[in-house]
Regions:
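NTP-dependent small-molecule kinase module
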Residues: 23, 139-210
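Pre-Walker A (Motif I) flank of P-loop NTPase domains
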Residues: 1-4
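A glycine- and Lys/Arg-enriched "phosphate-lid" helix/loop adjacent to the NTP-binding pocket
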Residues: 100-169
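Walker A (P-loop) phosphate-binding loop of P-loop NTPases
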Residues: 12
Length: 210
């Protein structure tokens, strides 16, 4: 079994940059690295992503949202993640099931026990070996997004500040409940400093796998 690393955190925390840097470094070390994101990562998942994040879908119910996220996740796990991990590779994923607990659980206030049951069904019990939470104040993260070049904000990014604050608190609560799996990092640090800490932790996880 390979190593499964997920990145979590509020919007604008720099996850995508850190995913790219980590994957490139691991590849240079000789590891077979797969990078992916949620929702998406498969043809079906990417189609679901378009529906989920379309700003025009303002009428989407929280229950619809969680089932769509879980459908995309089930496809990603079965089609992409499990085969790569079974072959001994490293998966670096930009968001995974913990985002469901933070955004749909804490953010939308859906029942966490129901979300856990749906998630277990969708993932077959697959859990990351290491989850890196890039944390920063919500206003700062959204400010980064606004000042970036990523184009129009998606449906989730357009939610009220209070929603994003609840989601952030959710990430921190999840991390506190599983300190062995989670590492919370200050995402206001320089990119290079963050990456150095991430690499040290990932190397330790790889050593434990051997």
């Amino acid at each position: 079994m390979g190593l499964f690393v997920s990145f979590e955190g509020p919007e604008g925390s720099g996850k995508t940059t850190q995913v790219r840097l980590l994957a490139s470094w691991l590849s240079e070390l000789g590891w077979r690295v797969l990078t992916t994101r949620e929702p998406g990562g498969t043809r079906i998942g990417d189609a679901v992503r378009e529906v989920l994040l379309d700003p025009a879908h303002t009428e989407m119910r929280p229950e619809t949202e969680i089932l769509l996220f879980s459908a995309a996740r089930a496809q990603l796990v079965a089609q992409v993640l499990v085969p790569h991990l079974d072959a001994g590779g490293v998966v670096v994923c930009d968001r995974f099931a913990d985002s469901t607990f933070a955004y749909q659980g804490y953010g939308r206030r859906l029942d966490l026990d129901i979300l856990r049951a749906i998630t277990a069904f969708a993932t077959g019990g697959l859990v990351p070996d290491l989850t890196l939470c890039l944390d920063l104040p919500v206003v700062e993260g959204l400010g980064r997004k606004q000042g970036g070049d990523q184009g129009e904000w998606n449906r989730m990014e357009r939610e009220q500040i209070e929603f994003h604050e609840r989601a952030r608190r959710g990430f921190l609560s999840l991390a506190a409940a599983e300190p062995a799996r989670w590492l919370v990092l200050d995402a206001t640090q320089p990119v290079e400093e963050l990456q150095a800490v991430i690499r040290r932790r990932v190397l330790a996880c790889l050593d434990n796998k051997m």
